[in-house]
Curated annotation (Swiss-Prot):
Function of the protein: May be required for the coordinated crosstalk of factors involved in the maintenance of energy homeostasis, possibly by regulating the transcription of specific factors involved in energy balance.
Induction comment from the UniProt entry of this chain: Autoregulated by a negative-feedback mechanism in the ventral midbrain and a positive-feedback mechanism in the midbrain-hindbrain boundary region and the eyes.
Biased composition (Gly residues): 210-222, 356-374
InterPro entries linked to this entry: HD, HD_metazoa, Homeobox_CS, Homeobox_NK-like, Homeodomain-like_sf
Principal place of residence: nucleus
Family: Belongs to the NK-1 homeobox family.
GO annotation, biological process: lipid metabolic process; nervous system process; regulation of generation of precursor metabolites and energy; regulation of glucose metabolic process
Name under which the protein is recorded: NK1 transcription factor-related protein 1
Composition bias, Polar residues: 170-181
Amino acid sequence: MSTSGPAAPGDVPALPPPPPGPGSGPAPPAPAATARDTMDGRAELPIFPRAGVPPLAASDTVPAVPEGAGAARPAAPPRPTSFSVLDILDPNKFNSRRRRCVLLGPVVPATCAPCAPAACVAVPAASGRSPRAELERRALSAATGVAAAAGAEPTSAGDSYRADEAEANGYSSGSGRSPTADSEDEAPEDEDEEEAPEVQDAQGTEEPRGGSGGLGARGSGCPGAAEVEASPVDDTAAPGPRGNSPGAPGPPATATGAGSAGSTPQGAAVTTKPKRKRTGSDSKSGKPRRARTAFTYEQLVALENKFKATRYLSVCERLNLALSLSLTETQVKIWFQNRRTKWKKQNPGADTSAPTGGGGGPGPGAGPGAGLPGGLSPLSPSPPMGAPLALHGPAGYPAHSPGGLVCAAQLPFLSSPAVLSPFVLGSQTYGAPAFYAPHL
């Protein structure tokens, strides 16, 4: 180095701790000759950019802009590479692409199809070199200018360190596969059985080659990297369609394996999804009829009393009864049809047009009242009916509580207000419990 007076500022890299002041960024362009001398020795190259740390932000986006006029002259012009400074600054992306291409060798285009193909094409030119030497050579070739050296050299050191760390963790080709690849290759036996035999052969040839089934795509910035990492079916068991398009994995595996590392939950999800569909189709096709109407106790009591009065309802009677019981007319009509069918089975040859009276068939509500004296006509007063209804009512209810219901059920020939008003008055006068309140 020169020790003359004008060149004293050029000795700043040799000083022990150069202060990185705010104005030290634009300072290096002045001593261009001394910078050229320091560029001749590669050993001092990492020391020089320490004084110019602020220009690092500019070097992220502008690839190689030399700060001095003679700063880029000693180095050869940069040879065209397929990556930019942003690729160097992304260690995971750069490391995974380089390692996958170096490990798999000549079959790079077929294996790296999900990634950008240009990133893997430039590597086989120097396939004879070791991964670390290739990494350092790329970093040095990209660091022709001082600004590019400031952005690339520390990152390249970190790149090589991360590559060594990845090899120590077991991600190299010799020691074995990554834990993700191990877990992916073990579990999906059931899915592999469903694949074609030639696909299984392709899988068997691909696994021993580098053992990095889920390694190359994991951590890379490719579009389909997430799908390839998450779905072992696309990564190992289906190499054929993988070369068609970058982001075109199989729909079932992508849907089920979106966020899971292992493939055991994926296999369960893949197998259970058709089961869910089959269950839904069975419930629709196997059970087309809807659920039966669940009648409450007071609705059954009122319907039975109405059936004892008459087995056939007119339109007005059916409407009034449906309104009083909070049912639809269809529900009332169907209940009466079923009740008539049951009554005909229990009383063969009986006159269906005559009112049933007190001697109705032993249905759910008419059985206990069959032997009571007197065939009760539809217009009978409610007190005589309280006794037969109390026999089949709940044990806790008093004898007069169903009597209020019978008033409305046993007066079918009155007008609509007359049918509803005895029901309301009866339930309030006789002190019916709150159990009947919703139907008032």
